[in-house]
């Protein structure tokens, strides 16, 4: 709390809206996971999205990115492999290490889901000016930086 009750109320309103946004994000992740594969869990969807975005990565990098336990990452990766969405290959730079590579099926399904999610976001933000959207992106960047 600060000495400015108006500022405190405004920050509380922002916090409330972030809670709503985070809840909505969890719902979208769950829906998106099911669109990729009926057996895919939301955590697996997030990992798969990151693997597709990166082109290839490793379990250690994913564990750091999502601050997840390595055993949880391993379980999700095993499921992604079983569903035919990810392949584990020897790292070309270090044959002892393994890299995760999305399959073409995964790339196609993630692209479709992302297109639908982006259309939803575009509809939600319709009517906002480019300047408003840039300001929103700036505020989100500040919040994400901590």
Predicted region positions:
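N-terminal leader segment of winged-helix/HTH proteins
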Residues: 1-42, 142
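Helical hydrophobic small-molecule/effector-binding pocket
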Residues: 25-28, 108, 112, 138, ...
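N-terminal helix-turn-helix DNA-binding core of bacterial DNA-binding proteins
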Residues: 27-71, 77, 83, 99
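Short amphipathic alpha-helical/adjacent loop interface patches that line ligand
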Residues: 18, 22, 44, 66, ...
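Short, locally clustered residues in the helix-turn-helix/winged-helix DNA-binding domain
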Residues: 23, 49-53, 114, 141
């Amino acid at each position: 709390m600060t000495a400015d009750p108006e500022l405190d109320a405004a920050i509380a309103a922002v916090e409330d809206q972030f809670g709503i946004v985070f809840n909505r994000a969890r719902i979208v992740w769950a829906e998106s996971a099911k669109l990729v594969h009926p057996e895919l869990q939301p955590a697996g969807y997030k990992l798969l999205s990151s693997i597709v975005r990166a082109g290839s990565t490793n379990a250690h990098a994913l564990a750091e990115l999502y601050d997840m336990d390595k055993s949880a990452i391993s379980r999700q990766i095993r499921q992604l492999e079983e569903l035919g969405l990810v392949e584990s290959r020897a790292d070309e730079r270090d044959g002892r290490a393994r890299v995760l590579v999305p399959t073409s099926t995964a790339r196609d399904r993630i692209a479709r889901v992302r297109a639908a999610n982006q259309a939803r976001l575009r509809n939600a933000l319709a009517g906002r000016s480019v300047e408003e959207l840039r300001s929103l992106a700036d505020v989100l960047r500040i919040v994400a930086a901590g």
